[in-house]
Amino acid sequence: MRAARCSIIRGAAGLRMASSVMSEMKEQMLKRSKVEKQTISELRKKHGDVKLSDASIDAAYCGMRGITGLVYEPSLLDPVEGIRFRNRTIPECQEVLPKAPNGCETLPEAMFWLLMTGEVPTAEQARALNAELHRRADPVAIAAAQKAIAALPASTHPMTAFSVGVLALQTYSKFAAAYATGKSNKTTYWEYALEDSLDMLARTPAVAAMIYNRVTKGRAEVAASSNSELDWAANFSNMLGFKDNEFWECMRLYLSIHVDHEGGNVSAHTTTLVASALSDPYLAFSAGLNGLAGPLHGLANQEVLKYLLSMQDRVKADGVNVCDEAALEVALTKYTWELLNSGQVVPGYGHAVLRKVDPRYTCLRNFCLRHHFEDDLFKLINIIYKIMPGILTEHGKTKNPYPNVDAHSGVLLQHYGLTEQDYYTVLFGLSRQMGVMAGVVWDRLQGRPLERPKSITTEMLAKKYLCTPR
């Protein structure tokens, strides 16, 4: 790696050195922003009154599902293709983004660069960004988070602990400090938001590792010290206590494909909404994590694993040999119809937007096939993957009978010995910060205002459309 060129700049915390990789990142962002500013101006001037969608009464009562009313730059979800990160599909990202030496999986820090700048980083830029993140992993800030987490009751859910840990890091927010002292303004908010985003990305792996070791060993500490020779995902895995390179590859994949899923989901929209009030990135992301912790959002992967384990128990209880695919298919078909006929749903199948197999599911499945998984759980999901679309189509109560990413993610983690189900959403959140922080920074760069939609009451609607006083 070439020697870093540095320049002196003044931030909220005083003088600091700006690395060349930061200069390159900002340069790419400003270049893109200049073009987009002209595009936005032209769109609003010529087509500002064009309706993107209709907000019906039905939609207002049904979670605003299907209403297009947000601009969110990092990613776009296509019902057929799946997620596009800066207009690149997951297979395209896997092809062009830098990987670890002798590795096959995308480096999450390279994905972060893509989300933040819209450009594919060089291998050198990815390495330099990783070095920048290591430099920003301030032990004093991390110790503050450790103290806060250690003070929580032992029974605290890992996602609660993660949210608390992020709030503890907020004490060191450069965005908040600059705003409070009058050093920032509308033209510089984005730079302070970027500073906080990078600091948070640098420090949250240690926080997440502490939470894992608190769950498994009862101590809020990392299993191994941070290693500046390792990439972001490998270093995190090492701090968890996992030394196997294959697991590191698994984490690179997991953390790179969960980074974003456009701006309308609960965690992304919550983060965006809170940040629109000029709350700093830590406050905004902590709010997003609280949304991610909900059973209908990030906890879905736990629900899938519970379902799979219950299926595994039934198979064993009925004496079905998991190596006998024909017998396993008959048994799982029977169990599935019993589940559906009881009014329940199959966890991990269906999606609010997608109408095909989630490409993230395909990535995880292909990883298992490449690494020759022979687990009973993998054999189960293989058969479920084969039979479920047909069963759900015949059942007729879903628009999408195909699997989403949650249908597979827990199986990988179980395979490598990360079996603590309550912890899985922390991994999701650790990854998701990359996308939502890119969204926050770009909102500030584009000068996006406070989000403030209008609400109505049932009484008002009844008076207007039913002509009945209430």
UniProtKB/Swiss-Prot annotation:
Subunit-structure text: Homodimer.
InterPro entries: Citrate_synth-like_lrg_a-sub, Citrate_synth-like_sm_a-sub, Citrate_synthase, Citrate_synthase_AS, Citrate_synthase_sf
Record protein name field: Probable citrate synthase, mitochondrial
UniProt record similarity statement: Belongs to the citrate synthase family.
A GO cellular component annotation in the UniProt record: mitochondrial matrix
NCBIfam families: PRK09569.1
Known EC number: 2.3.3.16
Pfam families: Citrate_synt (PF00285)
Residues at the active site: H297, H351, D406
Pathway listed: Carbohydrate metabolism; tricarboxylic acid cycle; isocitrate from oxaloacetate: step 1/2
